[in-house]
């Protein structure tokens, strides 16, 4: 246990001088004496000086203060004691409910599982959300990205998925709030409490107001807790909101450490940092981690380096569209942009595959006809095209669905729709079984039976 002293403080970056024969390793955690602050070594500058990044506020620190090395990386509580608790990046409880009382602590920097340990599977994970189950089905043990600009519903979709999967799937979940609003973290906690699933969720928060080092590491803290559950032989869910803020924190840290920026000002190590996190989120022969990650898309530009780097790691992408949200269709998932590796007849079956592709074909054709309709009007279309447009508008409305987590705002009770009902409903619309029903009947309902009931009242 070596000790040194602070020689320079620039914002969140602190240089500490140690005796030359006792220089701590990179990623080692240091504690400032007489303060709550934890530092993480990022660089060794030579002459016994290390450059560190602070995990908390640097207010009140000054040169000359003593710093002790802990001899290991940041370690956090793991295991069942973390369930139902809110913790920070260091694993300290922040829910005012006493100490965690864990039996074990793990370091947050760990090696990803080797090729030999990894396991893949094709089991589907039903979400109860029609549009997702139909066009971009999730795999158990897969990685899913929720892409969307500001205010199109990433967090609400994420909360609905957690509620549905936690209640139906009844496994353990870990939620990592990375650089998001404190208000959302609070809403989320109460939503979980009201749904009686809090005792199955471990919450780790590093909110927007935290220093960049904190936001960069909080995703690893949550992941470490999920890895523990996986290694115990469980199927665990890992939710990360928001992966873009993880990248952004990396950009801030990179700039503070004086590295040259790369494209659009991002850190030169963007792909490597993303890989370090994503390669650990994987399923092994012991258990699985199914991860759902919200990805903020800056200025709605999917080609921005941050979302573009994330795409490469995912099995399914759910793209939320501002155009669809502006039509009042929620969840605002774009069925033409969203993709999944599971959308294969050998995995999901022929009927599901043909229905999903049929829905996409009808919507794509409608998109192409919109220009003609705008210029010449509906009357100029052929009879076949008129029928196709009518079905497309029904499909578009039937892709909307009332959410449980939005009941407070909409006043409409939430709906969980099984995969079987989803396929039956869309298959019926495509075949023309419901051509006689008005399109309003399909808006904001659960299964097709509800649409038929609603049509009787119109």
Swiss-Prot record:
SMART domains according to UniProt: AAA
GO CC annotation, single: proton-transporting ATP synthase complex
Lipid bilayer topology: Peripheral membrane protein
Cystine bridges: none
UniProt xrefs under SUPFAM superfamilies: C-terminal domain of alpha and beta subunits of F1 ATP synthase (SSF47917), N-terminal domain of alpha and beta subunits of F1 ATP synthase (SSF50615), P-loop containing nucleoside triphosphate hydrolases (SSF52540)
Binding site for ATP: 148-155
UniProt keyword annotations, A-Z: ATP synthesis, ATP-binding, Cell inner membrane, Cell membrane, CF(1), Hydrogen ion transport, Ion transport, Membrane, Nucleotide-binding, Translocase, Transport
Gene Ontology MF annotations: ATP binding; ATP hydrolysis activity; proton-transporting ATP synthase activity, rotational mechanism
Subcellular location: Cell inner membrane
Function field: Produces ATP from ADP in the presence of a proton gradient across the membrane. The catalytic sites are hosted primarily by the beta subunits.
PANTHER family to which the protein is assigned, alphabetical: ATP SYNTHASE, ATP SYNTHASE SUBUNIT BETA, MITOCHONDRIAL
Protein name stated in the entry: ATP synthase subunit beta
Protein's organism: Ectopseudomonas mendocina (strain ymp) (Pseudomonas mendocina)
Taxonomic lineage: Bacteria, Pseudomonadati, Pseudomonadota, Gammaproteobacteria, Pseudomonadales
